[in-house]
Design a protein with these regions (language model features):
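Active-site flanking residues adjacent to catalytic metal/cofactor-binding acidic residues
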Residues: 2
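Active-site "cap" helix and flanking loop/linker of ATP-utilizing ligase/carboxylase catalytic domains
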Residues: 5-65
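Short secondary-structure transition/capping segments
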Residues: 25-40, 77-97, 127-128
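Generic structural signal for individual residues within well-ordered alpha-helical segments
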Residues: 28, 71, 110-113
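Short intrinsically disordered coil segments
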Residues: 46, 66-72, 117-121
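Active-site lining segments that contact anionic ligands and/or coordinate catalytic metals
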Residues: 46-51, 74-76, 96-100
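Glycine-rich active-site loop/lid that clamps phosphate-bearing ligands
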Residues: 54-88
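Generic C-terminus detector
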Residues: 84-128
Length: 128
């Protein structure tokens, strides 16, 4: 064994995508396990969830548009920006370098992917 990380998955997998696609609260289940309790991990439903990360070229953010439009799309559950106008954007070398992300939920995985892909078309980030 090289490494063992007894933790929840990152990049919104256990905090957002699993609950949106199955109804399972992974955070609660993890806490229950830590307390020696037996968590309920039976799926409550079967849906699709997807995430797309916002990427941009290097530079300083001059403008961000389209967020209100994306927030109004049915099935878009979360739009998160981690950078703002005036922030420096560098080449992505880790999760903390991301500008933000969009998460969707739909009846199928493909429909959720399509929602995210459509949402990304509306987000415009200008850098200099």
């Amino acid at each position: 064994m090289i490494e063992l990380g007894a933790r929840m998955g990152g990049d919104c997998i256990t905090t957002h995508l699993v609950p949106l696609s199955t109804g399972i609260d992974m955070v609660k289940a993890t806490i229950q396990i830590a307390l020696g309790e037996c968590p309920s991990i039976a799926p409550r439903f079967d849906k699709g969830a997807a995430i797309r990360y916002i990427e941009e070229t290097n530079g300083v953010i001059e403008n961000i548009s389209g967020i209100d439009k994306v927030n109004s799309i049915n099935g878009i559950e979360h739009v998160v920006l981690t950078k703002a106008v005036g922030d420096v954007v560098n080449r992505i070398s880790s999760s903390v370098d991301r500008i933000g992300y969009v998460i969707s939920q739909a009846d199928t995985a493909q429909a959720a992917i399509d929602l995210c892909e459509n949402a990304m078309k509306h987000i415009v980030i200008t850098t200099k």
